[in-house]
A protein has these predicted regions:
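Bacterial N-terminal signal peptides that target proteins for export
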Residues: 3-16
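C-terminal motif of bacterial Sec signal peptides marking the signal peptidase cleavage site
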Residues: 26-29
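Bacterial signal peptide processing site
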Residues: 31-33
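Contiguous beta-strand segments within globular domains
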Residues: 36-66, 161-178
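Surface-exposed binding patches on compact interaction domains or structured appendages
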Residues: 66-102
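Aromatic sugar-binding surface patches on proteins
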Residues: 96-112, 203-210
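Surface-exposed beta-loop interaction hotspot
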Residues: 116-199
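Extracytoplasmic/luminal low-complexity segments enriched in Pro/Gly and acidic/polar residues
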Residues: 194-265
Length: 265
């Protein structure tokens, strides 16, 4: 028996297997995921909030096909996929200057925190006026909503940085409005809480410093919860949103976001 005769059954089996796979893919409607031509930057987010409150956040979108703002101009509503605890109350679309080959836009979304608890979101659902719907990956966001009202009268949080160049550091600057009160802790992630034992110091009524962030996401969105003690009672104060790493985003970071969106879409 020749070598060629030995190979024939193997080649025939390979042909049959390939044919079955191709037919299966066709019947299932499966196809290779194309590169996303419209996508959002993939953020890692932590948002502390009191129940029955709202917060406006900015989400950056990109398009390689047409003007990014034009893609969403006929959007009727937006929601987080699989998350009913956090509602997008309203939104606006703003054009942004292009970055390299990417047309950019900003979605300013007002989030309404209606239910206490810790929930996640990984995708934004956009419903358009023509009845169509599109889901866009946004990274991994955690919403930490508690039945603890915001005692903003105890702390000035507006002097804290709203953005920086370092994605793995959370900067803070808080000023006590009652010098008899004291800052006890800062929660800046689902399992990340810094207290006085971790080096939080207050000098002349001001707490200032930087807290290290785990992971390697290029940009983090962090809205912290600060615990303040006054007359022996602990109260919650909610900081402003900080876009850690947002001032140093590169075209390579945007390409990575496009690749991630293509994989998870």
């Amino acid at each position: 028996m020749s070598i060629t005769e030995h190979r024939r059954p193997s080649l025939f089996r390979s042909f049959c297997i390939t044919l079955v796979l191709l037919l299966s893919l066709g019947l299932c409607g499966c196809k290779a995921q194309p590169e996303a031509d419209t996508f959002f930057f993939q953020y890692e987010g932590y948002f502390a909030a009191p129940v029955s409150s709202t917060l406006t956040v900015a989400i950056t979108g990109f398009s390689t096909k047409e003007a990014c703002a034009a893609v969403f101009q006929n959007a009727a509503s937006m929601s987080f996929e699989g998350n009913d605890a956090v509602r997008i109350q309203k939104f606006s679309i703003e054009p942004h200057e292009s970055i390299g080959a990417y047309s950019a836009c900003v979605v300013r979304a007002t989030l309404a925190f209606e239910t206490a608890g810790v929930t996640d979101a990984t995708a934004l659902c956009v419903q358009f006026r023509d009845g169509s719907e599109q889901t866009y990956p946004i990274g991994t966001w955690t919403f930490d909503v508690q039945d603890a009202p915001d005692h903003a009268e105890l702390l000035n949080v507006w002097s804290s940085p709203a953005s920086n160049r370092v994605g793995n550091m959370f900067p803070y600057h808080y000023e006590l409005l009652d010098r008899a009160a004291s800052i006890r802790s800062i929660q800046y992630g689902p399992d990340q809480i810094a207290d006085v034992a971790d080096g939080i110091t207050v000098y002349d009524g001001v707490a200032e410093g930087k807290l290290a962030l785990s992971g390697d996401a290029p940009v983090r969105l962090i809205r912290p919860r600060i615990k303040v003690e006054q007359n022996g009672e602990a109260y919650s104060v909610y900081g402003i949103c900080c876009y850690c790493g947002a001032l140093d985003v590169t075209e390579a970071d945007i390409q990575a976001a496009q690749d991630a969106a293509s994989r998870t879409a």
